[in-house]
A protein has these predicted regions:
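Membrane-interfacial helix-loop segments of redox and metal-homeostasis proteins
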Residues: 1-369
Length: 369
């Protein structure tokens, strides 16, 4: 195995271990890390949505961005660039978030859920892989959001600066923010521990180019399995940890913060996989890229934040399975509004894919960021 593969394996193992530790310290079950859920919680904390159960300034998001920033500066890999179809990326980011919240998790949480025995997430993985496969068909035919261009360092540092400001405010003036008193938002690891763990994870993810989409995409497109090792390492560590601690629960019904409406688990992750291929990386990768100076990825993250606000203000997000008073399982899922949003998102992915195809002869596949 090449050296770079070991870097990816180590990074994946650390991510899996970090997720287990954060869950032990107070984060929700099977949610040691979740980019979609944590961005959604921050969105609620700053008042952009009113869902009282999912409001908290998650230091994990701040730490991931700052860890990537610190590592990229230390290794002289910080490159300020932007201008690659930012408006399109904003829209794609919003719909990737809507798809993730329909499923109740980003690709990273999908792996954590599978490691905890949640078979609904296996259905999500099928949809995720299908979405990646569809996106690859357009990459093969020359899909491109065009190149980014060098910009000033201030432009490249927008998201690290925003996250630093958010951290200062939540420490100095916590009364500015909304915090959940019950539900997933009320369950969290101590702020300092979560921040430090996330900084380490962010730094390693930057160094290893860790990406949940990239592993499957590269395996399909180039027969290159290096990034896939990270995906597998996360799963193996989380599975082992859950088996050791007795937290492993195999099945579909009543999994932590999950629903067993399988069609929408599948389609939600089709939307996430397809959109992430078009964007050049999963939600985790977008945070890391923004931390190392990519202004287009910062725009994508802002799009995801707006998508989270829309998802909860308009009732688009999934609802978990529950037990009623008669001890019967009530299957969750998404509302009619959410179903329309997911289907609309898939149509928008198709439109963006077709619109950004070369108008003449086929072009080479755009390299992943």
């Amino acid at each position: 195995m090449k050296k770079v593969s070991w870097i990816v394996v180590i990074a994946g193992a650390v991510v899996g271990l970090a997720a287990l530790v954060l869950t032990h310290l107070g984060n929700p079950a099977n949610m040691g890390f979740c980019i979609a859920c944590f961005l959604r919680d921050i969105t609620g904390a700053v008042g952009m949505h009113g869902a009282a159960k999912v409001q908290y300034v998650r230091p994990e998001i701040i730490g991931l961005v700052l860890g990537a920033f610190i590592m990229s500066v230390a290794t002289k890999e910080f490159r300020a660039k932007a201008g690659s179809s930012p408006a399109t990326r904003f829209v794609l980011g919003a719909f990737v978030m809507i798809g993730a919240l329909a499923f109740l998790g980003c690709p990273l949480r999908m792996v954590l859920r599978i490691g905890g025995g949640d078979l609904n997430a296996v259905v999500g993985l099928v949809g995720f892989t299908l979405g990646i496969f569809i996106g690859i068909q357009f990459l093969k035919r020359g899909f491109s959001l065009k190149r980014a261009y060098p910009v000033g360092k201030g432009e490249g540092g927008v998201l690290p600066i925003v996250m630093t400001g958010l951290l200062i405010l939540v420490i100095a003036v916590p009364s500015l923010f909304k915090f959940s008193e019950e539900g997933p938002g009320s369950k969290h690891a101590p702020m300092l521990a979560a921040l430090l763990i996330a900084v380490v994870v962010g730094a390693l993810a930057q160094r290893a180019r860790l990406c949940m989409v990239g592993g499957i995409r590269d395996a399909m497109l180039f027969k290159d399995f290096k990034l896939l090792y990270g995906f597998v390492a996360i799963f193996v560590v989380v599975l082992a940890g859950n088996l050791i601690t007795g937290s492993f629960k195999l099945g579909f019904a009543l999994q932590p913060i999950a629903h067993s409406s399988q069609l929408w688990n599948l389609l939600g992750m089709v939307l996430v996989g397809w959109g992430s291929v078009l964007l050049g990386g999963c939600p985790l990768r977008q945070l890391i890229l923004a931390g190392e100076g990519n202004g287009d990825s910062a725009v994508t993250v802002f799009g995801m934040i707006v998508g989270a606000a829309f998802a909860h203000n308009f009732g688009l997000a999934g609802n978990a399975d529950a037990m009623n008073e008669a001890k019967e399982v009530v299957v969750g899922g998404i509302s009619n509004n959410g179903k329309v949003a997911v289907c609309l998102g898939i149509l928008i992915m198709l439109g963006v894919s077709l619109w950004n195809m070369p108008k003449t002869a086929s072009a080479p596949v755009e390299a992943a960021k």
